[in-house]
């Protein structure tokens, strides 16, 4: 079953989106259908000689990158809406979009609906920690949450870690301002109490910002506001560190020689930290697989997002989440 790729979402749509689709098909053998305006997609496919390899599902409307949830309601035939409809109808196994995060989240909730018992869907990102990756959620879907939602995010993240990362009994950490149980605001304190008593979760307690990349836990739970700020801070820190490193290497012949000798290792480090390599974030808690690629994704990032989506669909992450939620206490739906 193909990936439904929103070809009109992203800073570099549709050209880089189409190029990424071609990479996914030719290099990874992943079937893709492009969803968007027919004429520009046909023109872009012809540049790659791929007009017969990748089908197009027509959707002449698109959400702009600065448009949010309300715009998704006003455009029921937008490319992201049609892509979600394909998954709901069973004609595609997953949705991939580099479009507006708010628009993708709102459209996903409207078109795919939440899994039984889900309070809110959450955006999960995989951090390149050692020895195993760490999942951070929520990374931006819900700026305001209730304590019960953080418990459910822990279940979503645990199911993702088990299915996608093959981690048995993932350890859960709650992001706050101190390791002691009493540290944090009312939301965090109550969430700590609930997580400590939640069956089926290996809750390791509170973690602080400096623990984000240490691999101390397998799943980090927080609200979407804090999670998004943390994620963007890490991305900016990585860019700053590499910029400083380039300047330091230029300072002397010895430094330049050292840079040349370590070039292979530096490239590997850059690859590990490159968002394009990891494919994007995953919107968990819906009746379908949704991958949100970085808005500035080039072809490589789009292709990686398609690979991630196909992998998650094949591993049955949505079903695994449903099983885990069914085994836990089901709260009432809030949306």
Language-model features, listed with the residues they occupy:
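Glycine-rich phosphate/nucleotide-binding loop
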Residues: 109-136, 216-220, 224-335
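N-terminal phosphate-binding or glycine-rich loops at protein starts, especially the Walker A/P-loop
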Residues: 1-41
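Short, glycine-rich nucleotide/cofactor-binding loops
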Residues: 3-15, 141-151, 292-298
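Glycine-rich phosphate/diphosphate-binding loop of Rossmann-like nucleotide-binding domains
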Residues: 15-16, 31-33, 39-42, 143-209, ...
């Amino acid at each position: 079953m193909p990936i439904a790729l929103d070809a009109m979402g992203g800073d570099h749509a549709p050209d880089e989106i189409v190029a990424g689709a071609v990479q996914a098909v030719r290099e990874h053998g992943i079937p893709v259908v492009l969803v968007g305006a027919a004429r520009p997609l046909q023109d872009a496919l012809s540049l790659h000689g791929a007009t017969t390899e990748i089908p197009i599902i027509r959707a002449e409307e698109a959400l702009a990158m600065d448009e949010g949830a309300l715009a998704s309601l006003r455009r029921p035939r937008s490319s992201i809406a049609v892509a979600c409809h394909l998954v709901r109808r069973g004609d595609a196994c997953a949705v991939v979009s580099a479009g507006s995060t708010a628009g993708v989240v709102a459209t996903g909730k409207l078109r795919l609906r939440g899994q039984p018992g889900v309070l809110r869907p959450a955006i999960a990102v995989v951090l390149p920690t050692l020895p195993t990756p760490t999942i951070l959620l929520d990374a931006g879907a819900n700026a305001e949450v209730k304590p019960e939602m953080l418990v459910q995010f822990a279940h979503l993240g645990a199911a993702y870690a088990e299915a996608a990362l093959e981690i048995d009994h993932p350890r859960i950490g709650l992001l706050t301002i101190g390791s002691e149980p009493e540290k944090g605001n009312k939301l965090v304190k109550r969430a700590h109490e609930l997580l400590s008593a939640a069956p089926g979760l290996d809750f390791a307690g509170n973690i602080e910002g400096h623990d984000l990349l240490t691999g101390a836990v397998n799943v980090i739970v927080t609200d979407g506001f804090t999670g998004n700020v943390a994620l963007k801070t890490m991305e900016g820190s990585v860019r700053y560190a590499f910029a400083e490193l380039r300047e330091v290497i230029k300072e002397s012949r010895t430094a330049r020689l050292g840079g040349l000798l370590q070039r292979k290792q530096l490239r590997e480090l850059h690859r590990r930290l490159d968002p394009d390599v990891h494919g994007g974030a995953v919107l968990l808690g819906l009746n379908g697989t949704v991958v949100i690629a970085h808005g500035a994704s080039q072809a490589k990032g789009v292709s990686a997002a398609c690979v991630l989506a196909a992998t998650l669909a094949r591993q049955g992450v949505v079903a695994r989440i449903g099983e885990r939620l069914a085994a836990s206490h089901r709260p009432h739906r809030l949306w």
